Amino acid sequence: MSQLTFIFAAMNAGKSTLLLQAAHNYVERGMAVELYTAALDTRAGLGVIRSRLGIERGASTFNADTVFDHRILERDTACLLIDESQFLRPVQVRQLHRLAHTSQVPIRCYGLRSDFLGHPFAGSAALLTLADEFEEVRAVCGCGKKATMNARLDATGARVSAGEQTLIGGNERYIAMCPRCFYLDSAGEQDAQSTAA
């Protein structure tokens, strides 16, 4: 039975690497795989999924207007892999859930669970609601513990606690942290207090 799977982690855990490895495994066995990534993430170029290890592969892009229905699938598609799935709209997650169950094509979405303030992305919240299976990828905090939170850094490397939810960046902009380090940091304390108020 095909299903919708959400593979999530904090920043820099290797989600894109895992997606690219999964794509390679299908292709190596002579199967067709379709890849999608968010159009707003152009760090590696438009329609390119690149891991921090340097491997990359071209992909179709999605934006807020993309409709995920049977028309996006090639006749022989064995699997649909979506990177940066936190940027999906909830209606798109519903479409993907429906597509997985009506097309018999497994759909695997890779993305962040929460933003730099610990708030859910709309796409991630919908995936946590509708996905049939979940896989958490382990990221490591600077203290060595499991990182589940993301902190945003400014140009000087200082942590910030305000700003737009979406600001595309990699290692220069974000750091994965365990919850303890996230909340002990002064910016995290300010956010926790403002959220509680």
UniProtKB/Swiss-Prot annotation:
GO cellular component term of the entry, any: cytosol
Catalytic residues in the record: 84 (proton acceptor)
Domain of life per record: Bacteria
Top EC group: transferase
Record localization: Cytoplasm
Family matches, as InterPro entries: P-loop_NTPase, Thymidine_kinase
A GO BP annotation: DNA biosynthetic process
Pfam families: TK
Keywords from the UniProt entry: ATP-binding, Cytoplasm, DNA synthesis, Kinase, Metal-binding, Nucleotide-binding, Plasmid, Transferase, Zinc
Keyword ATP-binding: yes
EC number(s) from the headed UniProt entry: 2.7.1.21
Residues annotated to bind ATP: 9-16, 83-86
Binding site for Zn(2+): 141, 143, 178, 181
Catalysis: reaction(s): thymidine + ATP = dTMP + ADP + H(+)
Keyword Transcription: no
Entry's Gene Ontology molecular function annotations: ATP binding; thymidine kinase activity; zinc ion binding
Family affiliation: Belongs to the thymidine kinase family.
NCBIfam families (alphabetical): PRK04296.1-5
Assembly description: Homotetramer.
Protein name: Thymidine kinase
Organism of provenance: Albidiferax ferrireducens (strain ATCC BAA-621 / DSM 15236 / T118)
